[in-house]
Amino acid sequence: MNDMLFRTLLKRYEATIEDSLYKIQSFNENNIIIPEHIDITGEIDKLLLIIAESEDKVAVMRKYYGKKEAKNTEYKIL
């Protein structure tokens, strides 16, 4: 996996995690109830699943491609 692809995927998963955490925080702090989403615990459960899946993907990328990327930083993509 090349460096740019690795960084792009990493940013995607990190953004997904941040987005989900923000939504959970908003539910918690503002007591927001959206008419289409009355099942708050169900919605938070879905967001937690999204976080867990994204964290798993980041862990797998770092396990299998992280060390390779640290060694291969000689080239630049224009």
Question: Which residue stretches match the model-derived regions?
Answer:
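Extended, charge-rich alpha-helical interface modules
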Residues: 1-78
